[in-house]
Amino acid sequence: MPKTYPEELAEWVKGREAKKPRQDKHVVAFLAVKSDVQAALDAGYAMKTIWEHMKETGRLRCRYETFTQHVKRYIKAAPVASPPPPATPPDSQPKGAKPEPKAAPPASESKSEPPKIGGFTFDATPKKEDLL
């Protein structure tokens, strides 16, 4: 007995979903080789060279544009861990003493205006000496 149209459609949809690429598979693949990419960039290799090698060896299957976006997002824009500020011991002053106020920076008494930007200014009324 032939299949009904809904059954045929259901099979087609299942087959189509299996073929549809997931957008995050390239992110997962990039994150797997992120440390290698970082090491190669630190060694001075160009991103294009790194991508070409990883594409030829099968480590990445994404386009170069996608690769550069992932490098920008996950390597270059990654927050760099900054060292914490040096901690001062809390018992450095006696408990009864008031902390000394910090001296305010000396204020300049004469505030100078920023220099005007030079350039072309248009005057709609011509000068007679310019016309002759």
UniProtKB/Swiss-Prot annotation:
Any coiled-coil regions, as ranges: none
Region named Disordered: 76-132
Record bears the keyword Protease: no
Keyword Electron transport belongs to the record: no
Biased composition (Pro residues): 81-92
InterPro entries: DUF5338
Alphabetically ordered keywords of this record: Plasmid
Designated name of the protein: Protein TraK
The organism of origin for this protein: Escherichia coli
Gene: traK
